Structures are given as C-alpha cells and as structure tokens.
C-alpha cells in the first residue's frame, strides 16, 4: 500500500468448516480476538468474488519465527492463556458446538470414512484406523463440560505461532476457530499428531506437565482451571484420532488429479502418519493407555 505498511492478503480457496462465507467468518474471528493483542488486526475482506473466484481478507503483518518446542513453550503458554482469558463477545458469530469432543469424533468418522472407502487405501492403515475409531468411541465424548467458554483456535501446530524472544509473540491462521473450552486447544497443542506435523518432536509427560504449569501461571486466576485435569485427557486422545483421520482424508485429496494446492513436505508427512509404525504407536501409547496419568498443573 501507499503507506508502506506490511500487510497480509489471505485468499481462501475453500472451507474446511463447510461455510458459504468462510472469509467473513475469519474476519469476524479476528475482530473478536483483537483485544488479546495476540492476533493480526483484520482490515477488510471481500467476499464478492467479482475479481477473484475466492474470498479475500487483508490483515496486518506480524513479525516472528515459528515455535520451537525445545525453547518456546513458555511463550506459547502466555499466548494461549491470553486468548482463552478473553471473554467471549455476546454477539460473536463463531460456532459453538454443544458437545465439542463429540463433534471432533464425528468429524473423524467423516474424514476417515473417505479413506476407508477409497480404492487406493492401504489395508493395514484401514485396519488400524478402524481400531482407533472403535477405541476412541468408548470415551465420554458427549459429557457436558463445566469449563468456562473460550475462543479456541483448533489449529495449533508450531507454524502458526510467531515467536519473538523477549518481546510479544502471536498466533495466526484463524481458519477454524470455535467457542469451546480451553482444554480443546491444549489437547490439540500437546498431542503428538500436532507436534510431529511440522517438526520431529513428540512431547514427554514431563514436557507436558511443565507446559501446563506455565499455562496456569500465565492464566493467573483469570478463569477457572479446575476442570482441566479431567477434560484435557479426553481432548488429547480424540485429537490423536483427528490428526491421523485428517491425514487419511488428505491422502485421498492429494491423489486426485488437478488439485489446486499441493505441498511436498505435506505429502511426506501424510505417508509417515499413515504408516503402520506410527498408527500402532498412536493406538498403543496414546489411546489404549492414559498417557497423561500423573501429569498435574
């Protein structure tokens, strides 16, 4: 622009939430989140599709590098605490699932189902996906939560954090925000299917316990954390299923001719996540046993 200000133009080619006005939804989310000081400022959006065949959003550019799990967990805890402490605006248009964990599980069934019905699916991957679906389906996915509502990102891989050591850090890529409970974000952030996506890191129980203590300190009593110990293991486990189910769906999409967007690194990760070794590891380590047992705030 004439001002010389660095801006970001986001062009949306589809909606993972199946919304007819995806770019307007993202604009609304960023508007709600503005008081946190942790997200881009939305400037305007155009969903007319008069010039481009897609919706477009302009927002401020923010500095920072991607999160490093080995050294940036304190910064991540502070970012998430500030976002989760934001009172949900009464007039928010963000979706609010009645039973968020159950909604995630249903999404997993839909995504994995596409792979299970695909003629190119690997038989071993299908067997293990079906086992994961069956085991996770036994969890109390429909239980109501006593946790206070919060705006959650639902997309907390390391590449969506902008870290500035010693200065303010940020969270970007607000494509799929919801009104839910903080445990949903924390379960997603800490799950191996998230940390391993852009890095080779899988967090230990000690790593997770240290992060949760930092998060509680950063929250500083701004909202009630008493239900977190009960709700976090549920979201942690269902997120593991969601991670591999998403990869299964993406493998089908990447195999389609004429796909608009592709990424070589993503294709490599899809193969890793759908391998027998990785799926077995998720099933035995994170689903068939309580990986977070003994981890406390």
Where are these regions (language model features)?
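Short, flexible, mixed-charge acidic loops at enzyme active sites
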Residues: 49-58, 184-186, 251-254
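Acidic, serine/threonine- and proline-rich low-complexity regulatory regions
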Residues: 222-234
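Active-site acidic catalytic loop and adjacent metal/ATP-binding pocket
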Residues: 1-4, 8-9, 42, 136-184
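An alpha-helical support segment within catalytic cores of ATP-dependent transferases
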Residues: 88-154, 164-166, 223-224, 285-294
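ATP-binding pocket architecture of kinase catalytic cores
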Residues: 1-106, 110, 118-120, 146
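ATP/Mg2+ or Mg2+-diphosphate-binding catalytic cores
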Residues: 127, 243-297
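Active-site activation/catalytic loop segments of kinase-like enzymes and analogous catalytic loops
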Residues: 186-223, 237-257
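Conserved protein kinase catalytic core
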Residues: 16, 50, 66, 161, ...
């Amino acid at each position: 622009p004439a001002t010389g200000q660095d801006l970001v133009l986001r062009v949306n080619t589809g909606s993972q939430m199946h919304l007819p006005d995806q770019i307007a939804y993202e604009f609304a989310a960023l508007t709600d989140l503005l008081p946190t000081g942790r997200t881009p400022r939305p400037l305007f959006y155009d969903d007319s599709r008069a010039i481009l065949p897609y919706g477009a959003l302009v927002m401020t550019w923010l500095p920072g590098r991607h999160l490093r799990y080995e050294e940036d967990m304190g910064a991540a805890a502070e970012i998430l605490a500030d976002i989760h402490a934001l009172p949900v605006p009464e007039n928010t248009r963000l979706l609010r699932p009645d039973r968020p964990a159950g909604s995630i599980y249903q999404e997993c069934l839909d995504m994995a189902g596409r792979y299970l019905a695909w003629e190119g699916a690997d038989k071993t991957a299908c067997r293990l996906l079906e086992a994961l679906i069956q085991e996770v389906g036994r969890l109390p996915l429909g239980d109501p939560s006593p946790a206070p509502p919060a705006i959650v990102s639902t997309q907390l891989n390391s590449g969506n954090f902008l870290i500035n050591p010693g200065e303010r850090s940020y969270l970007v890529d607000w494509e799929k925000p919801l009104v839910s409970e903080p445990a949903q974000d924390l379960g997603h952030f800490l799950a191996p299917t998230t940390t391993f996506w852009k890095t080779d890191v899988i967090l230990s129980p000690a790593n997770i316990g240290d992060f949760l203590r930092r998060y509680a300190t950063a929250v500083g009593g701004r909202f009630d954390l008493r239900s977190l110990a009960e709700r976090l293991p549920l979201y942690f486990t269902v997120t593991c299923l969601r991670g591999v189910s998403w990869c299964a769906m993406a493998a089908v999409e990447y195999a389609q001719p004429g796909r608009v967007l592709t990424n070589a690194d993503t294709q490599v990760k899809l193969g890793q996540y759908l391998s027998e070794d990785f799926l077995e590891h998720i099933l035995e380590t994170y689903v068939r046993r309580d990986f977070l047992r003994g981890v406390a705030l």
